């Protein structure tokens, strides 16, 4: 995406495969000299999965109103030592009331944006790539778990107004980049069958139909953590996957409170293994 830009959407399968080969070969040459047989096998597996993953991302971008605008975006007020000109967003800073400051720093895998001039807003979606199985559970966020993606999202909403005028949280999604293979009944298979691999996405989205529909324009449920009625097109499972602006604000404020509590405990010498 970074190298091909908008042209990435129109690459043929053969061109995608060639791009993967070039990128993997480049990485191996720079980082993995003298590979073992086992490592060579694992690299081959990575190549195959990347071809499928990029195909999925192509399908997503072809139908989505959102566009990737940043990759590995640093949230930090200090320049990167290796690349001082790299784009970055200032972190949120919270005061604990005792003279200490909490700074939220990190790196966002991908940021997608959809400007809506009529509303004077730029809606932002954070995409967090994960391997294996990863399920977003909002109830765990309230206990201080699985907070990273939302912390990044709320940081962008508060501190990325210069880069993205009217920055507004549209949601965050985990993209399972190396999911477990799906079980398929052999009776459903044919010699010609070669279904495109799917990569589950789950997370929390803004409860605004025009926004989540822009992420999945045909209502397939393939690109958002939602199920749509085949008859009405309405969302069926919205309780834990959609939140209106007021609810997102409450979640943001709750996370701020958790971070301040953590800081107070650390400075007081209370470092229990919680929550576990």
Can you describe what each PLM-predicted range is?
Residues 1-276:
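Structural signature of nuclease core domains in nucleic-acid processing machines
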């Amino acid at each position: 995406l970074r190298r091909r830009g908008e042209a990435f959407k129109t690459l043929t399968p053969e061109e995608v495969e060639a791009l993967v080969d070039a990128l993997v070969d480049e990485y191996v040459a720079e980082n993995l000299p003298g590979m073992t047989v086992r490592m060579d096998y694992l690299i081959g597996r990575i190549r195959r999965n990347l071809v499928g993953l990029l195909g999925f991302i192509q399908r997503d971008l072809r139908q989505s109103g959102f566009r990737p605008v940043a990759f590995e975006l640093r949230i930090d007020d200090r320049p990167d030592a290796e690349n001082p000109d790299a784009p970055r967003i200032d972190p949120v800073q919270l005061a604990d009331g005792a003279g200490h400051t909490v700074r939220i720093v990190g790196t966002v895998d991908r940021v997608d944006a959809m400007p809506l001039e009529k509303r004077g807003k730029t809606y932002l979606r954070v995409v967090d790539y994960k391997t294996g199985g990863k399920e977003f559970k909002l109830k765990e966020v309230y206990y201080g778990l699985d907070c990273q993606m939302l912390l990044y999202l709320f940081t962008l909403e508060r501190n990325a107004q210069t880069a993205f005028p009217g920055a507004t949280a549209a949601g965050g999604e985990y993209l399972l980049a190396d999911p477990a293979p799906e079980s398929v009944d052999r009776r459903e298979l044919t010699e010609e069958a070669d279904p495109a691999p799917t990569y589950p996405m789950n997370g929390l989205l803004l409860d605004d139909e025009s926004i989540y529909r822009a992420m999945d324009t045909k209502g397939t449920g393939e690109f958002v953590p939602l199920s749509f009625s085949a008859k009405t097109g309405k969302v069926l499972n919205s309780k834990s996957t959609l939140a209106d602006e007021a609810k997102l604000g409450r979640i943001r404020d709750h996370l701020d409170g958790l971070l301040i509590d953590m800081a107070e405990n650390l400075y007081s010498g209370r470092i229990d293994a919680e929550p576990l």
